[in-house]
Each structure stands twice: as C-alpha cells, then as structure tokens.
Amino acid sequence: MPKTTKNKNKNTTPKSKTKKYLESANKKSVTKPKKEQDKVENLFDQPFLGEIKKNILKKTKSFNSKKKETVKSKSKSPIDFFDETKRGVFIVPPETDILSRRELNQKTVVNTVPNQTSSYPTINENKLVELNNQPETKVLETKKDSFTTTIREKKLNPEDSQAFWYIFVGDRKYGFWKNHTWVWLGYFDQLQRWNYFKVIETVEVPQEHAAFIKQRPADIDFWRPLVGNPNYGFVQNNTWIWKGFFDKKLNWIPDPVRFTEEALGHTDSLVDEIEKKTISEQPYWEQENDIVVTVFNTKSLASSLENELLLENSSEEQPVIEEVKPRRNEVIFRNPVTKLHFEKEKFEFLNPVKETNETIPLIEIVKEEVKVESEVEAPVEIEPEAACEPETTIPEVETVFVYEDDLKGLDSNQTQAGNVPEVETVFVYEDDLKGLDSIIKDDQQHDEIAKHVEHLSQDYSKEIKDSAKADLSNISDDIDSVWKEFGSFTDETQKSVEEKSQVDEIILDANNDFINESLFRDEVVNNIDSQINETVSEQQFEPTYSVNEFQQEFSEPVVSDEKIKETNSDESVNTDLTALFSEKLVNEVLLTNEYVDVNAPFSTETEVKVSSELPKSELVDEITFINNDPKPQEGLEYKVDFLETEPKSLFDEKTTIVVESEPPFIQPDLSLELDSVNDVDKSLETKTTSVELNHEEIGNEFINLDVSEKEVQEQPTTQLETDSEFVLPTYQIVEDSFTESAETPNEFSSEQKDTLEFISQTQEVETSESNVPTVEQETKLFEHQDENNLFTPLPLDLTEIIESNALFDSKPDEKESSDSELQPTFKEIKLDSTVEVPQESSQVEATFDTVQPEAVFDEIKTQELQPEATTEVVFDDHFQPDVQPEQTPQEAKFDSPVEIPQESSQAEFHAEQISDEIKLEEKTEAVFDHQQLENQSEETVVTPTEVTAFEPETIETQLEPSSEDQPSEPALDQNHPEIVTAEVEQIFDGTKLEDLKLEEANFDNVENNEVQPKETEAEITFDETKELQQETSSEPLSTEELKSEATFDNVSEAESEAVFEKPQLETQTEKILEEEPKSEPVDQLITEASFDTVKHEAVFDKNQTQTEGLEEPQVSSEAEVVDQTTTDTVGEPEAVFDVQPEKTTEVKFDDVENQQKVISEPQVEQQPGEAVFEPSAEAKFDSPVESVQDSQPEPVLEEVQTQPEIQPVESQPEATFDTVQPEQTPQEAKFDSPVETVEQPEFSSEPTQQHVESEASFDEPNYDFDEPNYDFDQPSYDSDLQPSEPQYDVDEPNYDFDEPNYEIESKPSEPQFEPQVEQQPGEAVFEPSAEAKFDSPVESVQDSQPEPLLEEVQTQPEIQPVESQPEATFDTVQPEQTPQEAKFDSPVETIQEPQVSSEPEVVVQPNFEERKPETVLEEPQADEIQPEASEEESLDWELLVGNNSYGHYEPDGEWVWAGFFGDDQKWNKDATVKWARERDYLPLIGDEVYGRYNNKGEWIWYGFYDESGDWVLVDEQWKNRQPRINEAPKFWEKLIGNEEYGYYEDNEWNWYDGEFDSEGNWLVFQSEETENLNEDITKDIPALEGYDIDSIDADEWLSQFSADDAKDVFGSNDKK
C-alpha cells in the first residue's frame, strides 16, 4: 500500500482528517511535514483503534486474525525495492502495499515529503490550471527550509518516496483488475495529472505471472521466470529493471506515469505566466544578477540524464520559488532558462550508454568555456576533446538554453564560447553572465547571441567548432530588451564560470556515463553547491521552452513575457557552441552541477534533453531520482523509443508545473521552477536514453512501453519531477486535483471526460470465461478482500471473476430463473391416450396419456415453454394436478376451477394478441360439448379462419408441448384429452387477457350461473379465439402467443358458436348456454368459454368442422403452446395457478356479462393470467387453450376463449379467466396462457366438486390440449367464465371426455371460450359436466400453478372493465393471489372434490380447461399480459416482485416495474420498459468499466442496458468519471439485510452499533451500555453465564445448539 504520510490526530477520525486535508488544500495551505507517527503503519497504533479492537464484538473471529495480519503487513515497507542504493541491483520484484482509496479517504493524505511543513502551500493540479489561466497569479511563498526531501533523504526514508499513484491502485475510476493485473484506464503525466486514454489503447496485460501464481502461489520466487520477460521489465546495464511491482497478493501493478507533450505544454504556459515572478531566495545563489552560462554537450547532457541532472536540481540546495518582485526589471525568463528553440533541428535523445561512451572531462571544456566566458566580449570557447563530439547517435542539434541573466551578461563572443560537438544544449545561468554587463549593454551583441542560438538550433547537424567569438549583435530586439531589463552583469559571472571550470574530475560510471555526484556525494555536492552559490543568482529561471517546441525543431524560442526571437547567430558561434557542447554533456553537466549545483533547475534545463533515465529518476521519485550512475535504476524504466523522439516543450511545461507543484517539495533554496526545469531536462535526456521508471514504466507498460516519442519525452520529465522532490508534491497535487476535480469537474477537459466515459463504457475487462464470479468464489473474493482491503478491488483470477456474482445481485438471476421456473415444461407430460387432433394448421398432435395434471405441471414448469417448439404433449395418467404455481401446467390440479396463474399469459394474454399469436383456426377446431356447441353455435361462432390461423402456429408449436407437458388433469380419460383440446380451444377462443379478467368474476356467480352455461356456450364467440388464433398463428412459439392463443378473440357469438360434438357436453352446455345466452356478448362468451364444453369434448359443430381440423393440430400445437407459454410463463410469473381452485373462485362471475362485454377480449389481453373459460360455451378450447395453459402455469382453463359473445351469459357470470391474470404473479402463473389458468380456478371451485370425478379423466385430456397444466387451468377458467350464470353443478363435470374433446385438442390452439364465460366474467359459470371433468385437471393445474390470475382469467383482453370480472371471480379462484400461490380457493376444493356441487353451475370441463393450457397461446402475450387482479389480487402485487414478466432488478438491487396495475387491477405493460437478460451481462462481469466487486466478492453493476441497448449508468459517481480521492464505493449497501450487520425494524434497516474500518471489516463497538446489556442478557439467558460475552460470536455460539436446544434456551415460543 502506498506509504503516504498522514497527520496523526488521535482526536479525529480518518474521515475528519480527510476533510481537513481537503479544506487545507483548497485554501492552498501546505500540509504539515510528515512525521514518524504519521506513517500508515502507525495509524493502527492510535488509541481509538486500539480501543475498538479491545471492545468490539466481532461477528467472525477470522476478521480479527485478518485484521492483525493486515496491520502487520502494513508495518512492512518495501525498503528493498525503494532503497535507492539497491535499485541498480535489486531484481526481486518490488512488493508494495497498495493503499486503497477507501482507506486513503479515511485517512489524511498529507504530502509525503518528510520535511515539509504545513506553512507551505500545497500545489495541486487545480493550482496549476489556475496559474495557467491566470498568468498574473502569484507564486506561492515558500521558505528556504521548505523543500522536498533530497535524494539522500529518500534513501534514508524509502517509504516516503513511494509512487504517488499507489493510492489509485484498486480505484475503479482509474482502472480495473484483470487476471491478477491492474489495468489502468489512463495515465499520469509528468505533472501527475490523471489523463484517461482518448482512445482505448490495446492493453496487453501480462498474463504469465497469473499462471505462475496459480501453479505455485506460495512460492516466493514465482517471479523468477518473469525475469527477462519484456512485459515485466527490461535489462539495463546488465540489471533487470521491473516495469511495475507485485503487491502482497502477487498482483502485477504497472506504472501509469507517462510523459506527455500536453503536460509539457501546460508547463510552458505556466512558465510564461510565472516569468514575472522571481525565484525565491536560493541560499547558494546570493547574487541576484548573476547569470551562469552553461553549455552542455548533448552527449554529456544525455549521459548526465542517466545520472539525472534533475536529481541535482532536486538536491537539498534547490531553492524554493518565492513570491518576489522581479529585480532590476527582470522579466527574465521566470524559468531559469530562456528557451531558444532550434527550429530546423530536432532534439534527439541519445542512448545514455552511447552518449556516455565518449566523455570529455567537463573540467577542460568548462575551463575553456569559463575562459571564453570570462572574456566578456569573446564568447567562451570550449573545445571538447576528441571525445567532445558525441559518439552516440545524439543529434548534432544544439539546444541552447539562455537564462535571462545569462543573456544579460552574454557577449556574442561568449555565445560562441561554447565549442561543443554537434549537439549542444546551452544553458546560460545568471552567474555565468554576471560578468557580461558590457555584452548586455550592447544590443547588437544581444542580437548576435540570439542568432547564435537560432543558428545552433538550425544547424544541429553541424558541430560547433572552436570559436570563442560569437556575434551577439544578431540577437533579437526582444532579447535586447530583455537584456536591458536584466541590467548589466558583473564580473562575478566570469568568476563563477571560472570557478566552474575548476572542476577537475568527471565522474563516469562503468558505462562511461557521467555521474552527477553533486547530488549523491556530499563532497561533490558541496563543491558544486559552493560554486553554484557563487555563480548562480537566486533568480534562476527554468527553461521556458517546451519539449514540444524542441520536438518541433525548436521552431520558436520560448521566452515568456520577454519574447526573445531566435536570430541566426553566426555559424562560427554555433560551431563554437556546438564544439563546446559536443564535448560530452556529461562533462558539461558535471560543470553544470558545479555551476548550478543548487540551481539544479538550471542544470535540469540544461538537461532538457532527458535521457531515458529521466523516467528512472521519476521512478526514483518514489525513492530516489534516477541514479546519478548511468546504471538502470530498479524502478520501472520506460524504454523510450518515443523518448528518442524530439522533446517537446518539456521544460516549459515541467517548469511551470514544477513551480506550482513543487514548492512544497522543492528544497527551500531552489526554486520549484528550477527543479522542474532540471526534471524536464532530465526527461529530455531520458528521451535520448531509455528511460527507467519503476512505476512510470509500469504505467507505460500498461499502455504499452512503446509510446509516442512525445509521451516518452513527457514521461521522463514527469518522472524526474516526481522522482525528485516533485513526486511527493505531485502526489499532493494529484490528490488535491482529484479531490477538487470531484468538485470541479471542469478541471478535466471535456475531451478527457469524454475519453473517460468512452473508456468506462468501452473498456472491457478481459476476463476468462471464469470471470463471472460464482457464489463460491464470491466467498473467496470476500476473503481475499478481507485480507487486502475491502475497499480495494481485488485482482481476481479470471476464474474468480467468473465465480463472482452475476451482473446484478442474485435478483437478475432470480428473474431468469423465475422465468424458467415459472414456465411449466410439458415435455414429460404424457396422456395415456394420445389425441391426434386434425390440424388444419401444422400443429403437433397432442397425445394425451391419461396423466394426472400435477405430474405434468411439474415437468411443464421445468420445461421452458417455447411457443415455437411444438411438441406432442403426452399426459401420463399419473399426472397429478397438484403443481407448484410455477410448475402449474403439469402439476396444476383443477380441484376446483383452478386458475393457473400464467405468468406469460397474464402478461401476454390479450384476446387480440392471443388471437393473433394463437391461430383461432385451431380454436375453431376446439371441440365444445354438444350443449355448449348448440348454445354457442347460435351465439358463439368460432371463426374457422381465426381458428385456423390460431391452430397452425399455436397447435403446432404449442399443442405438442402441451400434450407432452400437460400433466393432464387427474383422471383424464384418453377421451378426455380430446375434450381437453376442445376446452383449450374454447378457452383461447373465449378468453383473452380480457377474458381472463372475466374470469375474475366471482366464481360464486359462476356457480350460480352454472345453470346458464348452455346459453353461454351457445353464445360463446371465438372473437378472442380469433385473436388468440391470430396471435397464436403469428407467435405460436412465444409465451405471449400462447397466451393469445389461450385467449380467444372474443369471436362473435356466431363465430364462437362452437357446438360440442359430445352429447354430454352439448346437454350440459345447452343447459348452461340456455342461461348463458343472457350474456350474449361474444366477448363474454369467449371470456366465458366454458371449459365445461371443453370438458365435454363436444366440438362446436361450426368450429369443429373448421376447428376440428384445426383443433386437432391445435391440441398438439396447443400443447406445444402450453409448453412454450409455460416456458414464457416461467419467465413471466403471471398466470401461475397453484392448482388451487380457491383463487379461481375469487373470480366473480356476477360481473361476467359486463366483463365479458368489456373485459372478455380486452381482459384477456390485459389479464393474460385471467383467461376466463366458460365451462359450457368455451367447453371446447382446442389446442389454443391447451397451448395457453402450457404457456401459462395455470391451465388454459381460464377459458381465454371466454366468448365475449356470451355476454348474455351474465346469468352465467362466466368469469373468463384471462389466462393472463397479470395480477397473479406471472411467475406463479406458470401456464403460458394465463387466461386459461384463471378460468380453471374459477370453474374448478364449483365444477371441480361437480366434475371432480369426471375431471380425473378429463383433466388429462385437458392437459392434452393445454400444454399439460393449462388443461387444468382451463377448467378453472371455465368455471370462472360461467360461474355467474349457470354455475354448473358438479354434474356438468360430465364433460364428455369424448373424442370431440380430442378434436378440440386438435383445435386447442384456438380455445373457444363459451359466450357464457365471456358474457359475465363475474358469472363465469362452468358447466358442471364440463367442469366436472375439468375439476381434476383444474386441480392439477391449480396445484401446479397458483391461480392468482383466475380473477383476471376472464379473458376478455379488450374488455378492460375487469372490475366486473373480479366479480365473476370464483371464490375458489383467487386470481389476485400470487400466481405462484394462485390457488383456486373454493374451486380448488371443488376441483379437488370430484363433486362440482360446490359450484354446480360452474362446470369445469376438464378436457377443455386442461386443454386451456393453450393459455400458452397467451404466452406470446406475456409481454402484453396485464396482471389483472381482483381486488384481492391487487393486494398481492408484492408477490410479483422478482417476476421477470412484471419488471426487473436494477444493478443497485432496485426493482423496476415493467408496467403498472390500473384501477381495474389490470396489468398495463409499459412497452418502453425493457431490460436485458442476465445473459447479456455475463460477458461484462469482471470488467470494471461496468461494475465492481464488493467486499464480499459480489459483482455490483454501475448501470444497465436500456431498451435501446445503450448502457445506462446508475452510479452517479461513476458518471462523472473523475477520480476522487475521498470517494469510496458504497460496498456496505450490499450488506443491508445481512443480519450480521444490523436488523430490520418497521421496514427500516438499523445497523448495529459499529462501523467499518479502513479495511472494510465490520467493527461492532461495545460500550459500557452494551456491557451492561450483556450482563442483562446473561440473566435472561442462563446458558450464557460463565461465558466471556465480549468474545462470544453469537452466531457461532448459537450454531452449537439444535432447534430443541434453542427452545430450551429461548423458550418454546421463540424459535430463533
């Protein structure tokens, strides 16, 4: 963890410290110097933490051990890695403790500079920006003694010199973990400003270490195989240098620091702004006017860069910039060096080794130079030895830095004085120019000097030959004015130059690279410092030129306010300078060090050409600056091919930045600007050479070591600055800037912001497939984080990531699971007798083994209903109606009219949609009991076309699944399957979502109206059936389609007039219809489509003819539909009817007529779960009904077909259960066709009792039609549809399990709801005979599916006045009950009891209703399903939470509804609300652009995909994407609800008395009160006596007791 100093304040918490720190930063106050006690490792020794440790009541003992371990690890500082003395030799990868941002936020982050006092201002990025925008900004005042630690100090305190960016590791704003590697989303420039990548760069994250870690995690030397791997480091001077480091968890963390032109340009502007400000007193520079002219050979400069002249600049003597008025009108380049750019020549960085190969002792050069300089008129000529010329490929371009003072004192001769080889960097220091007053006086001379500079820049390829004479007359007028401002120079300048020349030795490393001992050796430093003191004036200026400009061929001299124009100096002068510089820069650098030892910034400027080592120095910044030795430093080293590129205005930007950022860091004497200049120079030099930057390089590695030259150049500079004292200041700056940036986002350019956003959105964390964390691995992650910090994202193996939690909380999974669970699978459902329904449309024949619906529903539930996939549904005779609501299709038992809440059906069932999706053709095929057929034949006309349309898709797709899946109501005879088919068809025809609403009609009414089912049947229209057919045909495979199929188009009575072939059905239907005709509305008929008729297997003659062909296919398709719908229904909790007729009973058929009219069609649509099935009229719901049932957990019994035409059936309040009873939890409504499901519950209550006996056989047939469970639902729907009018007695259960039903099965896709049901959803009456048969199926359906939809079952999607439907709700059917719970209260009982007596009128036609599994038809309507719940249901909407059909969970765990419940309790789906399935998120798990892992390893999403597929962020903090040091993830939010941390009281979460420590450990404070409380507890709980309560883990303690023991301890009443 990064070692950052922290003010230790026992009285303040870390949070308060952070606030104080931020406030002080805002006030531009300097933080107090770091003290020993402020170290992170000492933080935990503070009394308040110690006290907490003693008094806390840990929930888990492991927390304590982990905490202790963590504390111990903190005490370990990576001294070896950061010890400068070992950097050149240390090979073991550095291991560092990364201080998480959270922890950092809780602790005061003080400047890491040890000797810094709070009296000094803190320079941050905001300050820099401010300076940049306000040239007149005053320079912060600093005291002489306020300077950053020297390199030597850093050696002594390596901990304090850690990279500033350590604290950002683990912060999701800055990067993400990938395969045990921290991947940065951007980089830090030399100003330590964070920059997001503008373009997502190809990040080649090293992967090798992850493999080694996995193979031998305990192997300390796991890194050895990585030595030599270019992804992890590089070799320099036979030393392996790491580009990053490994943290305690062996995660690889690269260095994010880069040198950028952009940052340099910023420094330039800052420099210009600062020019008017004087450099603070520099203890060694006593002469204000002294200007030192230092000519550096590029070679020597490069080599010195290896040695890091910047280090010299950062030497203890560095002056700190103070606010001083310019002396003598010195507008002098505020930066010690006036930047003269060589337009034609590009500065190139030499390889430090090459550069150092030949070095001529600077002493000689300096001597010559000093001599020349001493001659005011004659430029100092330094003839480099033969070695003077760079052996390396150093460009011949000379870089001349002229300080204002230097220019003042320079004569043209002096300008010539430096005879440096081809490339020369000329730094003119005040001291050097002090004696050149005469030159300054001569404007022409000044011009000449300028010309020299310009010429040198132009003729970099030319070596400056010895020429002591340089014409300064060519210097630009600007320079003249500047010189004038400077004033005359004294001879002291010459003196200083001479003194500089006195240096006798050049220190070279093994590579012949110049070693600047001034920084490292006290003796040398002393010598140089003394010389500098004499030679350099306090007013040294950092170079104003920017690296960019250098790279730009130094096209323009950058002289801030004093615009010095570069004039072509005489070639001779250039030659002289070139010759002088061609001498090894090392020598010159040495001189420079001697000259400006304290004036390191000048030397830095001189070294503007930073060799690659400059980055080293930055690395060193963590510990030391680049080793003076050319030896590579251990820190990361950037191999800067890009560094080799021309430096661009490195100095300027650096200088400016340094001035602002370094003041707290710069040694008191040296100005910040000078330091920055030095750093810049080194950075340039680093360019010439490969840059070693431990951390910097790591950062680059993340990006890729190969960076543009600009970046390289810039990076070295930054590194130097950071490596020198500037690093610590930079850290402060970064911190402040980020902190402020949080407040002032404008700090980041909009471009950066865009980049950040782009990155955040586009950056994908590369994770192995295992990146999706599993629950098990979540635990691992949690533990892992406990070891580290809960606050820091733990680098996870790909496996870990995969194992970690899914995108959303478990909730998204729950949705999908609910979908799958809710959707009954019918594939295993088998009916002993296979009914082969003639399929006009290609519909799968549903073979109905006489299987009890329950068994079928179970399997159906497991099977996702796939409307498209049509499979034969075989109902085993053993199929049990008892089905879990979700499994309803198979298990649903139509004990009483069981509504199978069909999730998808409820949501999706709309008469229109269903008809569209489910082809009514099949519905027309629906076989109605002859009675119903007769009655419905008049009113209920099943449009063959609709049926046909409905049949093909629904039947094909759904019938088979329904037949397979349809458990077939218990005791379904092989004949019953046929009947079931008819029922299903009726249900679909009659019931739509609206019909389902009819279903809501009280089943009591249905019972009362059961006498009317015949009329209803007669009236049954397949309008809904048509719609269902249409829907089914259009979308036979989708749950919605199934639902739509389940619900019938409310076909006009004429259309819905389906005659049940079976005489029994006809007889019963006739009776019922006779009463039902009262409610003639086809819609009602459809809604009321009585499953009774369906049960009777009677096929409407008209419909049969048309429908029969269709019905048979429909039965198959319907079964298929049921499967599909069930599948969809699983997705949609809607019409899942627990084969509990009681809920269906809730549907009141009294209002059936109204509902039938209003609701029959609309209801079906609106209330997919409410498919209302009129027992008689809709008795025959062909495959559509079955399919609906399949789609809906609740059998199509709702008789989605509830034929609105049967509105007259009001007497028979055929509570058409919209197979889609949205109110019923879609999840519960597993039967895709909620309508059928609803109806069944209704009918099931009464007819179940009546027809329970017959239902045993009919149920299976119903399932045959319905996709297993829907058959059950259908009967209940029938009862719902018809209960109001003729509430058929159990007698009506005598649904003829006649093959007509099977024929109907062929039609199941177009279940025809008898008009009765549609007419009066409240009255939904199931013909006793039909229902009797459906009763068992209904029971099974109900068992399998909750029938909350039953009330809504009145499938009259169009008829939204569901209110009437609720009236029609059968008491047995309780649609509002959660679809899962949807139980047909009385209907279930009724259904369970073969006797329909409870609701005699409600005749559950087991065949038809079971066939109603066609509610699957409504499956397609799952989206449309409008959970239309009765008033009771409205109270159960909470049960729908988590049902994917009704909404979804956001990443933050918030449940978002996909619609709303209207006043009529109908579910109104909001088409605009869409969400992505979890599978859409799985590939993103582990990508920290999209989320993060919390302290328990759970994946937390930042946003979600909206309906347009766009990623929408919900984390406001993340939206800004601006790093905030004090920003900590709200990991604790996920702990809400965890009883280990608190408890709920009055629906409000209360935390235990405690808090999270910096590591995310939960600390429960124990006060005296708690101790007393514990004492009281011991009294209450004698078993606790004798225990050390303070150390007791309650959970652990309780775990040793059994339930009986707990009773003994806590009492029999307390089961806890």
From Swiss-Prot:
Name the domain of life this protein comes from: Bacteria
The name this protein carries in UniProt is Protein P200
The residue ranges flagged as biased composition, category Acidic residues, are: 1256-1270, 1288-1302, 1416-1433
Q: Which InterPro entries match?
A: EAGR_box (IPR022466), EAGR_sf (IPR038145)
Biased composition, class Polar residues, residue ranges: 1200-1227, 1242-1251, 1276-1285, 1353-1380
Annotated GO biological process: adhesion of symbiont to microvasculature
Q: What NCBIfam families does the annotation carry? A: EAGR_box (TIGR03834)
Alphabetized UniProt keyword annotations: Cytadherence, Repeat
- Which residue windows does the record flag with biased composition (Basic and acidic residues)? 1012-1029, 1059-1081
Supply the Pfam families for this chain: EAGR_box
Q: Where is this region: 2 X 32 AA repeats?
A: 1205-1389
Question: What is this organism's lineage?
Answer: Bacteria, Bacillati, Mycoplasmatota, Mycoplasmoidales, Mycoplasmoidaceae
Q: Where is this region: 2 X 26 AA repeats?
A: 891-1389
Spell out the residue ranges that the record assigns to sequence repeats: 1161-1186, 1205-1236, 1310-1339, 1358-1389
Q: Which organism is it from?
A: Mycoplasma genitalium (strain ATCC 33530 / DSM 19775 / NCTC 10195 / G37) (Mycoplasmoides genitalium)
